[in-house]
A protein has these predicted regions:
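Short, contiguous pre-domain boundary segments
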Residues: 13-42
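Active-site flanking loop/helix segments enriched in acidic
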Residues: 53-81, 130-148, 419
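N-terminal acidic, proline/glycine-rich, low-complexity intrinsically disordered segments
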Residues: 1-15
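Short hydrophobic/aromatic beta-strand micro-patches
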Residues: 292-294
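Alpha-helical phosphate/pyrophosphate-handling elements in metalloenzyme active cores
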Residues: 51, 61-95, 101-110
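Short, mixed-charge amphipathic alpha-helical segments
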Residues: 37-52, 107-119
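Internal insertion modules embedded within essential enzymes
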Residues: 9, 26-31, 48, 108, ...
Length: 489
């Protein structure tokens, strides 16, 4: 590590430098209202959190983000996200300090002395590697991801801080150059959104996915967003009526019933329209109603009542209560026909299931779940241990990261044309699929393909981030048959 001597002591709040930017104008970094909320919660050590903020603000003084904002606004924003998740003192302190070792003269030993080994582990886990002799940006990225996963294996809060860090960076990605927007969006879809899903942190997962799609395929994003906006306007009265009807049936016989509604996320629609080839009108869960009740028995009773009220669609019922998802998600899902034959999804769960569904692993800290919460954490992290055990045989970081991406992979990949346009395909798609995704005429005249500049067989399975060039004949009908079983689209 480079020499980081002569480090000044952590400044007290009263010793903070004047609130100035490069133009010497006062600025609000958002800490004051955030700290006021912290002080209302007795479980937080406000003195330690304020001390961490004071160090971060002093250390980042004179540093600015691409937006022109003082850098301190970023760690404060990350800490706010973690506070909203209900994370603990160490996690919030780690968030405030997460870039201090990477970008300032302070080292990890100093963090250990001032804030303890637990915070130091979290900060070190999200700190990128220093100057090491690596030849490519891909190697640097791979080494950083490996370092993060190793730390995550010791303390899952490392990745929770990193998810919040990535979320705020994606929220402000409009200030990045286009190449970085694309690179970080791909990484977000390949690594960070799937991790959020595995950990059950739904809100972060969905926002990361939507932001990544916005930068990877802005045309598709805007088209879906426009359609969803119309659906939201059309469905406002419809959903209000549905909720009123269900409430009238359930509230007289059940206590603590909550009924809410939502319109599906952009990425959720994107996967069905652009990956699975469905028409917008064929998506049955654009509208959804959520019913939260006190007990598991109430869940099944509520299911029977809504099936009496509305016609259930065959094959659309899923019992994730008796068979939870791998990320411990539990709910009953059913799709029914409402007034006017409009389909909508109903999700039914208990309050405990709802906390787990919304906050995932973070619910352990937010709701102090005790031993049961610890068991839930162990179950959720089993995949990390297995993944790292499998990766121990990898000869280098890039091999390990390929294994990680493969383990996390969803059912979609993103492949580029030589001009930089992006095509979204199902996982396992071949270059034939890519050709037909461009246009049927291209697929019909296809004679071969290059991936990353090298000739590949037409059965080659594409991977996210690759550049595919389709080679064609001037004569139509010379390409591979679209009836080939290889075709995924």
């Amino acid at each position: 590590m480079e020499n980081k001597k002569s480090i000044p002591p952590v400044p007290a709040a009263a010793e903070l430098p004047p609130e100035q930017t490069a133009d010497h104008k006062p600025y609000d970094d958002g800490f004051a209202p955030f700290f006021a909320e912290i002080q209302k919660k007795p479980q937080y050590d406000s003195a330690r959190i304020e001390k961490a903020y004071s160090l971060a603000r002093s250390a980042h003084e004179g540093q600015f983000r691409r937006s022109g904002e003082p850098y301190i606004m970023h760690p404060v924003a990350v800490a706010k996200i973690l506070f909203q998740l209900g994370m603990d003192n160490e996690c919030i302190i780690g968030a405030l300090l997460h870039d201090v070792v990477e970008d300032t003269p302070y080292d990890i030993d100093y963090i250990t002395r001032e804030f303890g080994p637990e915070v130091a582990l979290l900060v070190d886990g999200v700190t990128k590697l220093g100057q090491i002799p690596l030849s490519t940006r891909e190697e640097v990225q791979a080494e950083n991801i490996r370092k993060m996963f190793m730390a995550m294996n010791r303390d899952v809060r490392v990745i929770i801080i990193k998810l919040a860090d990535r979320l705020h960076n994606m929220r402000t990605a409009k200030f990045w150059p286009p190449y970085k927007q694309r690179e970080k969006s791909l990484e977000t879809l390949e690594i960070y959104a799937p991790i959020a899903h595995r950990l059950g942190i739904r809100a972060i997962k969905e926002e990361l996915e939507d932001l990544a799609i916005f930068y990877l395929d802005p045309i598709a994003y805007k088209e879906i967003e426009q359609n969803l906006r119309l659906k939201q306007v059309e469905g406002e009265r419809f959903l209000a009526d549905i909720k009123t009807q269900i409430r009238a049936k359930l509230e007289p016989i059940m206590k603590n019933v909550q009924i809410t509604s939502r319109v599906k996320s952009v990425h959720g629609i994107f996967r069905k329209v652009y990956i699975k080839g469905k028409d917008f009108e064929q998506i049955f869960d654009i509208y959804a109603v959520r019913i939260i009740v006190d007990s598991m028995i109430d869940c099944y009773n509520a299911l029977g009542i809504v099936h009496d009220m509305f016609t259930p669609l065959p094959g659309r019922f899923k019992d994730y209560i008796s068979t939870p998802k791998p990320n411990m998600y539990q709910s009953l899902h059913t799709t029914v026909l409402g007034p006017g034959g409009i389909p909508f999804e109903i999700q039914i769960r208990t309050w405990d299931m709802h906390r787990t569904a919304e906050y995932g692993i973070a619910a352990h800290w937010k709701y102090k779940l005790g031993k049961g919460g610890k068991d839930s954490i162990d179950n959720r992290l089993e995949w990390i241990h297995k993944m790292l055990e499998t990766g121990e045989a990898s000869t280098n970081a890039e091999d390990l990261v390929r294994n990680i991406k493969g383990d996390l992979s969803s059912d979609e990949i993103f492949v580029f044309t030589p001009n930089g346009d992006i095509k979204t395909l199902p996982s396992g798609a071949t270059v034939i699929d890519f050709a037909y995704a461009i246009h049927s005429a291209v697929g019909n005249r296809m004679t071969g393909a290059k991936v990353n500049g090298k000739i590949v067989p037409i059965t080659y399975k594409l991977k996210t981030g690759e550049i595919c060039e389709v080679l064609t004949s001037n004569q139509p009908g010379k390409g591979p048959s679209r009836d080939l079983s290889l075709i995924h689209i």
